């Protein structure tokens, strides 16, 4: 049996965009996000980062958080330039169909459905995420890889950013 493109022999989890976004701009969770992503990139944490999560992080960081585009581009490009085996490059029609099925069945976003489909495809049930909505999927385990106090600070920081005048 061959392994899927972008996979390794053992995958512990799949990384959600919500873990990548804090690495893109100054915030209380930035260092923890960089440390965790670094561990994934060198496979100390055997997980996959969908390349689509990098694109999604750019969208979220620049559009919703209004982080500087050039700085976000540089951070995300530097992650990709590592050419780490942690990156999962493909969204196959099979995974897209499964993603849509999970999204419809569990009333989650299609992107979250893709994370579920990818995790199960890779033989794991763990998704590293700040998104508790993923817990709706009973056979998936959501792991938040950061300390609770830092997450609280991050959410307060983001809330203040979003409510501040431009």
Language model segments and positions:
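Short secondary-structure boundary segments
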Residues: 51-52, 131-132
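Short active-site oxyanion
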Residues: 43-47, 85-87, 121-126
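Acidic, metal-associated active-site segment
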Residues: 17, 109-126
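Acidic catalytic patch
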Residues: 51, 80-104
């Amino acid at each position: 049996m061959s392994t899927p493109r972008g996979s390794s022999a053992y995958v512990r989890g799949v990384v959600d965009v919500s873990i990548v976004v804090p690495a893109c701009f100054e915030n209380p969770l930035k260092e923890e996000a960089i440390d965790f992503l670094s561990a994934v990139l060198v496979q100390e944490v055997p997980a996959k980062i969908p390349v689509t999560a990098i694109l999604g992080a750019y969208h979220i960081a620049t559009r919703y958080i209004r982080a500087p585009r050039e700085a976000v581009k540089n951070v995300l490009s530097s992650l990709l330039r590592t050419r780490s085996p942690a990156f999962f490059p493909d969204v196959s029609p099979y995974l897209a169909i499964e993603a849509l099925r999970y999204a419809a069945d569990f009333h989650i976003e299609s992107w979250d459905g893709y994370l579920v489909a990818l995790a199960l495809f890779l033989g794991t049930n763990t998704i590293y995420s700040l998104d508790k909505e993923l817990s709706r999927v009973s056979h998936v385990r959501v792991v938040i890889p950061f300390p609770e106090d830092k997450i609280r600070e991050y959410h307060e920081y983001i809330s203040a950013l979003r409510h501040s005048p431009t």
